[in-house]
Regions:
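Histidine-centered active-site microenvironments of extracellular/periplasmic hydrolases
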Residues: 1-52, 59-62
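Active-site-proximal N-terminal segment of extracellular/periplasmic enzymes that hydrolyze or transfer
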Residues: 145-152
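Secondary-structure boundary motif
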Residues: 6-9, 97, 149
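C-terminal cap/loop subdomain of S1 sulfatases and analogous C-terminal strand-loop tails that border
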Residues: 21-27, 33, 48, 53, ...
């Protein structure tokens, strides 16, 4: 960033820094990075846009959202119907804004939908569910307490699983 300043380019350069997802070192019995837990699916994303106030924003954003965001910022037309992502310019302009409710993760027969509050995963064999996990990301950041049998969350769990099935069907088209 200092070099962009020195060259006089900082006022016209968008900087995007993203990282790879995490690596389990024995947490939850995993060694590696290929599973549906938050530690293995969450990745850092830092975006610096000239004339945008800096800060930390919440909300759900996926890497597929970067391209449409850059298109909007650079006033480049977005190819209609060809992108899965959605511009997160509204979040850059106001950290309280949201562009989507869920992020979707898929790995080897497992499907996970992640909202700001919950992470819900199912594993399918054919159309049959053979495993489930639900975590409250506010009260259990480390994902240690599977809430799948929680009566108090039954409606939320049902809605999250419905969203997983909808997203899975969309991807199969």
């Amino acid at each position: 960033l200092d070099e962009l300043e020195r060259l006089g380019l900082a006022g016209s350069t968008i900087v995007v820094i993203l990282g790879d997802h995490g690596w389990h070192l024995g947490e939850h019995g995993f060694w590696g990075k290929h599973n549906l837990m938050n530690h293995a699916t969450r990745a850092p994303l830092i975006v610096r846009v000239p004339h945008c106030k800096g800060g930390k924003a919440g909300g759900v954003v996926e890497f597929v959202d970067i391209y449409p965001t850059l298109c909007e910022l650079c006033k480049v037309p977005v190819p209609e119907g060809q992108l899965q992502g959605k511009s997160f310019v509204p979040i850059l302009q106001d950290s309280e804004k949201r562009i989507k409710e869920y992020a979707f993760v898929q790995w080897q027969g497992g499907y996970n939908i992640v909202s700001e509050r919950y992470s819900s995963a199912i594993w399918l064999k054919g159309d049959s569910v053979v495993g489930r996990m639900v975590f409250d990301r506010q009260s259990d950041v480390a994902e240690n307490e599977n809430k799948v049998g929680s009566v108090s969350l039954s409606e939320e769990i049902k809605e999250l699983e419905t969203q997983i099935r909808i997203k899975k069907l969309q991807l199969e088209k």
